[in-house]
UniProtKB/Swiss-Prot annotation:
Residues 149-188 are annotated as: Disordered. Belongs to the bacterial ribosomal protein bL9 family. Keywords: Ribonucleoprotein, Ribosomal protein, RNA-binding, rRNA-binding. It comes from the Bacteria. Transmembrane segments: none annotated. It comes from Gluconacetobacter diazotrophicus (strain ATCC 49037 / DSM 5601 / CCUG 37298 / CIP 103539 / LMG 7603 / PAl5). Binds to the 23S rRNA. One of its GO terms (molecular function) is rRNA binding. Residues 149-170 have a biased composition (Basic and acidic residues). GO terms for biological process: translation. GO terms for cellular component: ribonucleoprotein complex; ribosome. This is Large ribosomal subunit protein bL9.
Length: 188
């Protein structure tokens, strides 16, 4: 399978900066970079077009980045509360998704698409989590996600108090102290 050459129209994490000519697998180009408008094919016509439009693209990118930086200053320290059902051990019935976090952030005044929410690990327990929201490819802010069973529990978690989560006992084990010793038969 051969690689496809593309010109990046914006910074793409783990790939390159705007204007870089990169080689990627055809599926990555076809399914992500091209449809999202993050890159164009690197043929002679597109290279000329990109060089002509480079100044406008860089100016547009700079404007968007400045808007994202202003928004990040305004929204720094944002915290959202998600109320979910959970078992006694603190395990959620389901998990918190990027869509849930995006909707909660939008309700808190930060318009966010679910694709902008970056979850390092799935959220499947009650507690406080730091999640990154990418406002621009070069600007991201931390958002604290407070997952609790009720508003009162969320307030206690935010203050740093331990919530009443019972520890699960391993099933099938009964703790008994046996003082019986088994002696090996003496060999004659």
């Amino acid at each position: 399978m051969s690689a496809v050459e593309l010109i990046l129209l914006q910074r793409v994490e783990n790939l390159g900066q705007m204007g870089d000519v990169v080689k990627v697998k055809p599926g990555y180009a076809r399914n992500f970079l091209l449809p999202q408008g993050k890159a164009i094919r690197a043929n002679a016509l597109n290279r000329e077009r990109f060089e002509r439009e480079r100044v406008q693209l860089e100016a547009l990118n700079l404007k968007r980045r400045e808007e994202a930086e202003r928004l990040s200053e305004r929204m720094h320290g944002l915290s959202v509360v998600l109320i979910r059902q959970a078992g006694d051990s603190g395990s959620l019935y389901g998990s918190v998704t990027t869509r849930d976090i995006a909707e909660a952030a939008t309700a808190a005044g930060l318009t966010v698409a679910r694709t902008q929410v970056i979850l390092e690990n799935p959220i499947k327990q009650l507690g406080l989590y730091d999640v990154r929201v990418a406002l621009h490819p070069e600007v991201s802010i931390p958002v604290t996600v407070n997952v609790a069973r009720s508003e009162e529990e969320a307030e206690r978690q935010a203050r740093g108090e331990e919530i009443g989560v019972e520890k699960e006992e391993p099933s099938g084990f009964v703790e008994e102290a046996l003082e019986e010793t088994v002696e090996a038969p003496a060999e004659a």
